[in-house]
A protein has these predicted regions:
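N-terminal low-complexity, acidic/polar interaction/targeting segments
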Residues: 1-223
C-alpha cells in the first residue's frame, strides 16, 4: 500500500545509511519539521528527492523531480531563536514517487517503498571484491591528482551498504548518483559503480586534476 510522505526536494541524492544535516529556514519546511517533531520518534520520516529541473529555494523553484528518492529519519532538530532549524537526518530506505500533492504548504508524495535486494548472489561477491579494489585505487588517484591526502572511509562488510557508500562518496554528477540510487538491486549498483570507478580513475590519472572529494557523510543543504 502506498505511503504518504512529506517531501524535501534537494539538489542532491541521499542514500540509505548516509547522514544528512540540513539547515531549514523556509517557512514551509519549518512547519514540516515542527509537525514531524510532534510525532513519535520512530514516525519522524520524510522523503528526500532530487530535483531534476529547478532549484531548492522559493515557492516556484522545483519544476520537476526524479522518480526515486530516499526516506530520511529525523534524528535531531535544534531550533534557533528566529525559528530556523538545524536538523540531523539519516537515510533509511528508497522509495518510488507515484503521485504528488502540491496543495499544502510543502509537497507530499504518495510513494512505494522499494526493497533492498542483493540481486545475483553468485555475482555479488566478485563484484563486491572488485569494487573495493577499484574504490581504493580511485581514492589513490584522487589524492595524487589533488595533491592532498584523501582519507579512506571504513568500508562496510555488507555489499548493499558498500554500494551506497561508494555511490555517495565518489565524485559523480547528480544524474549518475540518481541512476545508482534507482538501480533495481545491489549487484546492479556494484556493477555500475565498477565501471564508473574505472572511468574516473582513468580520467584522474590522465588529467591530474580532480574535483573536491566528497567524503563527508552528507553535505549541508541551504534549505
Amino acid at each position: 500500500m502506498p505511503l504518504r510522505l512529506p517531501l524535501f526536494p534537494l539538489g542532491m541524492v541521499l542514500f540509505p545509511g548516509l547522514v544528512l544535516p540540513l539547515h531549514v529556514f523556509e517557512d514551509r519546511y519549518r512547519q514540516m519539521v515542527r509537525e514531524l517533531l510532534a510525532l513519535p520518534e520512530d514516525e519522524r520520516r520524510f522523503g528526500v528527492i532530487a530535483i531534476r529541473q529547478g532549484r531548492e529555494v522559493g515557492a516556484d523553484g522545483v519544476q520537476a523531480l526524479y522518480e526515486v528518492g530516499c526516506v530520511a529519519h529525523l534524528r535531531r532538530a535544534d531550533e534557533h531563536e528566529d525559528g530556523r532549524f538545524d536538523v540531523l537526518t539519516t537515510g533509511t530506505t528508497r522509495f518510488a514517487l507515484r503521485e504528488l500533492d502540491a496543495g499544502g504548504p510543502y509537497l507530499v508524495g504518495s510513494v512505494d517503498v522499494l526493497p533492498d535486494r542483493l540481486g545475483n548472489e553468485d555475482e555479488a561477491p566478485l563484484l563486491d571484491a572488485a569494487v573495493r579494489v577499484a574504490f581504493r585505487t580511485y581514492l589513490g588517484a584522487l589524492a595524487r591528482a589533488s595533491r592532498e591526502p584523501v582519507p579512506l572511509p571504513e568500508l562496510p562488510d555488507d555489499p548493499l551498504v558498500l554500494g551506497y557508500l561508494v555511490a555517495a562518496t565518489t565524485a559523480l554528477d547528480l544524474d549518475e548518483r540518481q541512476r545508482l540510487l534507482a538501480q533495481p538491486d545491489g549487484t546492479s549498483r556494484l556493477r555500475s559503480e565498477l565501471a564508473l570507478l574505472r572511468r574516473e580513475t582513468t580520467l584522474l590519472t590522465r588529467l591530474r586534476a580532480a574535483p573536491a572529494p566528497e567524503l563527508a557523510r552528507g553535505p549541508v543543504s541551504p534549505n
